[in-house]
Amino acid sequence: MMNDAKRNQFREDDEEDRLIDWGSTQSLQSQFFDRRPAVVARQLLGCGFARRIEGVWVGGWIVETEAYLSSRDAASHSARGEKPGNASMFGRPSTLYVYPIHAKHCVNLVTESVGCGSAVLIRALQPVWGIDRMFQHRGLHRSETTDGRALTTGPGRLCQSLAIDRTCDGVDPIRDPNWCVFSGPKLPSSRVTTTPRIGISQAAELPLRFFVDGNRYVSGLVRHHRRPRRDSL
């Protein structure tokens, strides 16, 4: 079961709690991540990812991921071996590997055993908790016409909304009380689409991107979806 303190904090913080059957919610354990990145990337879809900032939980459901392999993957940061900047990618499974790109950041969850150098990039969330705080972090004004896609669609926006930067690199969200990764809505295989990864120039042909088909918070092209991109979990 999810840690009682974390569960109670979620209940106190957000009206969206009514949508969640907390009795069936479980925090993911290190064993979940100690598997091949493609398997983890697929099974993270529909899971919750959140952190607590100044007493407020911010986060949502994972709706898009990409797997980065420990070998034969030129796009992976581990392709040239362990270095100071990517050391967390070789750490314990479930560790956060955060790296900067174009003045923004990307957040990954490390997979497989220590020293392997594989991870799953979280590309998009469906925002659920602490939405007002996320708008503040993004420097946006919330209104009835503001699209929530501006918060957590794409890895850079996602990190900005959750105030994730290099200071978060190396954190283990399974053990840190201010982070949480937990099970969520179960997705049938018909709701999951697999495509090549996007936004990279090497090994771009590998089918290692996974997303919730039809979910409006997924990044990338509409034509990648089999159903209209307007649904939520």
UniProtKB/Swiss-Prot annotation:
Tagged with keyword DNA repair: yes
Keywords: DNA damage, DNA repair, Hydrolase
Record-linked SUPFAM superfamilies: FMT C-terminal domain-like
Tree of life domain: Bacteria
GO MF, any single term: DNA binding
Keyword Repeat annotated: no
Pfam family, one: Pur_DNA_glyco
InterPro entries cross-referenced by the UniProt entry: Formyl_transferase-like_C_sf, MPG, MPG_sf
EC number: 3.2.2.-
UniProt record, GO biological process: base-excision repair
Family in the record: Belongs to the DNA glycosylase MPG family.
Protein name stated in the entry: Putative 3-methyladenine DNA glycosylase
